[in-house]
């Protein structure tokens, strides 16, 4: 019985198309492919960068021209001669590494593969022979099932040779994408060497089997053949990792699971796709060949490690083809577009449109797939064209004394891009204007230079200016470009003479003099100067402002004299200064005028006597309780004011007898009682105040002193204050008159209110509130809904004599509001009651009737009853005219009361006169 078991893997070897179709009839003499199917190399644990590992041999039966090698690892590459080397330093993580090497012939598009094994630190032995790889080539599908076993070791023992269990390393399974089938398509066969002893069931697990995407791969549980069930797409998934399991019929594990790695071989089924369909770039005009412009990028979804995903770029067309049809070139691998020729000039060509093509298969136009994009290259402007004046000389004219006036417009020509720093002009005056009268501003729209006056020019000083101006750009000129001689021009500016206003050389002229000078005094001569030296003109003077009307000016020579006495204490004086403004006007065309201000500083003289302060005060009856502080005010200033002298006059003698003054200092003194007691009242105390002027002035002022009884604090009591007020006879009479007028007004108001109340009471007696129908509308004919026809002539109803046309109408249907046809009843005529001779009797009669019936209204109301239709429900109604005299008795109406007295008078008759 064996001590170990084996799990066998039968691989399908992918070869040429003839092998896939099972065509075994044609076997060429030269069969393209690798010399071996498996290559083995022994390597160290640490592989150095560039280290040669082995050399594979391949023959395409055409001299291997154009054959390219690829590996499925980024760590290793194969040179054109088949030498395999390490791209960089590699640290082997396991004892064995298996790679796949692919040879690709771009002419026939054939692909051949071989397995390369790297074994770390051991020499592989197999019966003393190096294992041979299997040659790839067309084989029959029926013959593809073969057992692939790794060499095993035999160990010497006491019992002889013993076969040990082998470790299986399954090489990757490569499946081309986009296969057309038929499906399912067999890939490999998995078999255990125990299948001869027991029944084994095989299964696979992993992504693509029992995990999404589900059922991409399947396995025959009995034979162990594994299939792919549908076309593969490497762009969806590039590899699959499955595990193969072998169990018995009871589900017990027979072999350890083995790992299956399935790689989807890329096919060229995706075109390169540009990231953008339109790329925008720019390059300066005049750039040298080789100047970088922009980069275009296209991505290919195919494997970038194979030719299927290797994109190459080229320029298809260039528009316009000026000055050369090949102004740009592109790096075929990176997509960088650079200039290849000189002569880029924005003024000639501002933009290029370049069509770029990206092709995979390393740019092979015969086999590769392509796509295009547009690159728009804008030639940016550089300052390679200096601005130039359109003419060498310019001229202008300006009136004198004018500023912010445009004298001349300077035009330039610049072929650079408008409204850019390379085009915007800057003007400078380089000579001819040392005083800075002019400046040149740039019009942002037209780029013209506007020569502007910023400092007024004087015709009498300069009649003309000769300016030299230069123009440049905001941006400096490009390297190698020189300024043009046309960038400089001359500007001639003529100054025209205008009538200038006269001016006062010493404006705000200040003079000093004492106040009080007499009228007619000559103060000064305030003359003006006419700057127009070349014009014969006369200057006339007049007053413009003289607030106090104190001054006169001579209209010819400007001499100023006083028209009134100047008073320093006047309200028109501010800080001892009086200001007046004068006008000087010439007789030019048009006339011009100027103003000047004269300031007169008035020196004070002692012309104002001091005034005593305060004017009123109060003091207690007893002299020891309080005093009055007094001072003085003087309209003058030092030294014509204090110190002041305060004294009492000698006449009348009672003043000095009752009062006394005590000096405190030069400005203040105290007034107090001299006697021990003074009766409460108001006293006029005269005081003489003298200033310190030269000569001194004095003034006798009256101070009203209220003498009143005081409390212990020295304050006047209320009674004392009233008594001290001392109302005079006139004040008392005025107060009495006011009181009498007020009482009279109150009395008149009371009388008026009484009369009004009496009238209101009288009217209330005549009117019952319930029967008061004044200002009320009483409707007696409301019978529901109102009259349908409101459009009728009321006058026709009131004038029967106008109804003849109605009587003549033919019988028929009539409106209910029409007057009935036929004779109307005649009522007896009531005797006429003579009108009362006296209107008073008539009024009294009505008043008596109202007194008898308090509910009667104060006046009669006219009630109008409209006609309500013809006919009656009664059989017959006798005419009023045919009724007997007994029927005409209306005496019972007299019993209805005063409210029906009028009705009784109308129908009851009356006594004959």
From Swiss-Prot:
Q: GO molecular-function annotation terms?
A: beta-catenin binding; cadherin binding; calcium ion binding
**Record InterPro entries:** Cadherin (IPR039808), Cadherin-like_dom (IPR002126), Cadherin-like_sf (IPR015919), Cadherin_CS (IPR020894), Cadherin_pro_dom (IPR014868), Cadherin_Y-type_LIR (IPR000233), Catenin-bd_sf (IPR027397)
Kindly list the places in or outside the cell where this protein is found, as annotated in its UniProt entry: Cell membrane
Sequence ranges on the Cytoplasmic membrane side: 754-913
CDD domains hit by this protein: Cadherin_repeat
Q: What main location does UniProt list?
A: membrane
Keyword field contains Cell wall biogenesis/degradation: no
Which PROSITE patterns does the annotation name? CADHERIN_1 (PS00232), CADHERIN_2 (PS50268)
Its domain description in UniProt is:
Three calcium ions are usually bound at the interface of each cadherin domain and rigidify the connections, imparting a strong curvature to the full-length ectodomain.
- This one is known as Cadherin-4
Species this chain originates from: Gallus gallus
Give the gene symbol.
CDH4
